[in-house]
Amino acid sequence: MTAMSETRLREDICRFGRSLFERGLTPGSSGNISVKLEGGGWLVTPTNASLGFLDPAKLSRLDNQGRPISGDAPTKEVPLHSAVYDTRGSARAIVHLHSTHSVALSMLPEIDPHAALPPMTAYYLMKCGATALVPYYRPGDPAVADAIKGLAGKYSSVLLANHGPVVAGNTLEAAVFAMEELEETAKLYLLLRGLNPRYLSPEQVADLVKVFGVTLPEHGQA
């Protein structure tokens, strides 16, 4: 990742947050975004803040241990973000939303906790690899950190049951794009549920792994 100034990162958080909000991907004051800083620590959106109306100057700045340094009070989901950063060395940004189709997917009884979505499209695999399902925890529960730490090393995207998706990326743009792909794939799954759709075959998945470097839990880090 090319080094970016803190000012630019603050602007990017607000820009992507507004885009996600305006497209209905996270309603009200739901959802949060964080980005690691080159000099240490990270930025995160404040508690009770709408992603559509963020102020770059009011974003919360935290140290490497997730303790507030400046800005407004941070989101209650700091333990979740900290757990991902502590476990997944490649993560430089995290997006957590309450997007409708991903939340709906997380509530279905048939979902495989190790692969919440089947291999439906090439781009889902290329952007997300695979998605794990985390059992329900109340928002802000510190216990979610332990559950996340057990998965973040293998998965770049997880679904919090009855809550919403969490996606990590090596840039904020990558995390946002992967989040969008996850939400669209969840929508496809719900549209096709019960219709016996044709998924990618094991051979087609293996080809994506070979040609595009797609990484899945059984092949390495996703």
What do these predicted regions represent?
Residues 1-222:
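Glycine-rich flexible loops
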